[in-house]
Amino acid sequence: MLAIISSAKTLNFEKLAPKTELTIPVFLTLTNKLLATLQSYSENQLSKIMNISAKLAHINKERFKDFDNQESKAAIFAYAGDVFNNIHIEKLTNHALNFLQSHLLIISGLYGVLKPLDTIKPYRLEMATKLNEINLTNFWQDEVTNYINKILAKQENKYLLNLASQEYSSVINPNKLKYQLVNVHFKENRNGKLSTIGINAKKARGAMVKVIANNLIDSPELLKNFSYLGYAFSTKHSSDNELVFIKS
């Protein structure tokens, strides 16, 4: 089984990461192509296309301009935000972290896909951002889908567990994915309707990654006992391709 999660806008390059063997992102050539486009933008253009403040545009302009000399950090330790904070990465054993290295991918607008220990530099680029004529979802779709197919071909249980947001999981082409896609949903009953509450769903996704790592889980079936923040598996609302957890 291979799980996917979204990258995060929030980064943490201040806190030191544990010493571990680092790896290199697989699509650096394509990353450099995107960087060339990003480096051509003015601060004002970055502010507009990314819908960010002038201050953030300045920070990212400086990052892109001197990208090669920026500090590097393992992706799983560099990203912050609700998903990553609830993985509690700093508490994972080396064994659990090594398991994630072969069973988790982080979807990124700049890097395409990242293994947890792939080194990244500080950046901001959401998958929905349009760069000139480049649609990032289309830009990455074939490369990412083919890469996932290659990884799953070597897995014992050939499932792709989708814990990413729709914005990022859209980079997977279902028509070219050779193996079973299993989507995970975290729902809450609000006024008689089942709804996804973003912040709670993000926390639950991170907690599920933590459970996968700590228990070496390689099958969606083994996740049905997952419970966090009051979520519980709903047989009624689930199917072979959809795992639905409802908050009581």
Curated annotation (Swiss-Prot):
InterPro entries: YaaA. Disulfide bonds: none annotated. GO terms for cellular component: cytosol. GO terms for biological process: response to hydroperoxide. HAMAP family: UPF0246. Belongs to the UPF0246 family. This is UPF0246 protein RrIowa_0836. It comes from Rickettsia rickettsii (strain Iowa).
